[in-house]
């Protein structure tokens, strides 16, 4: 499973993993055995701990009653919650590698492609290559500009800002792109201050394989474990000390291997009734 596969990466940062579930101990033992889980899985059949963390899923009914909203807490050695990562919809969840990237932005993500374009170098990476429906994945575009060259940040007036535009396939949804804080550049020639990026900077955008939005075609695609492409473009206008070059666009592409959900249940004798 995703969390087990990321266990070593967390431990290299000095973090230990534990999971908690409303399932009884026999169910968790069966699950851990089938998936070779090597971190503690804690049974909370009355959802007392789940309620204490205020993550009880109010929409869960029947045999799922008592279930927690899926997500992550980063808790320090004193028991203080330092960070938490939960999606608005209980069907969606961040992947473990996604959370590592949010906790430790300096960690290298898996590089997808490197593109040499007019006045910039673009490196594409992603938090995960293999996901299941409901996963939230971070796509990253690292931009490297030559010396004395800048591009304009979103929000600039009168110039073409840098903009990452994604065309997500059916069944996927994207959140707004996240840009770094710009620096303010004073343009002596026109006596004007403008927000810009120079040197190297990173743009991030999360995409979600949304279970609730899967149509018949997308559901069939994702259920077979095929590769899904996310394409788009990086639009920008590069300028140096004397010239603003014509607006340009670079195509971008990431690929995800979407595996079907594991719907196998524990033996009937220990299942939720």
Describe these PLM feature segments.
Residues 36-40, 55-61, 65-73:
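Structural micro-motif
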Residues 23, 45-47, 78, 169, ...:
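Solvent-exposed coil/turn segments that connect beta secondary-structure elements
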Residues 44, 75-76, 241:
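Short, acidic, Ser/Thr-enriched surface-loop or helix-capping motifs
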Residues 100-273:
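Extracellular/lumen-exposed scaffold segments
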Residues 64-124:
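Thiol-/selenol-based redox modules, centered on thioredoxin-like
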Residues 49-54:
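Short, charged, surface-exposed secondary-structure boundary motifs
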Residues 1-40, 45-48:
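Structural microenvironment flanking redox-active thiols in thiol-disulfide oxidoreductases
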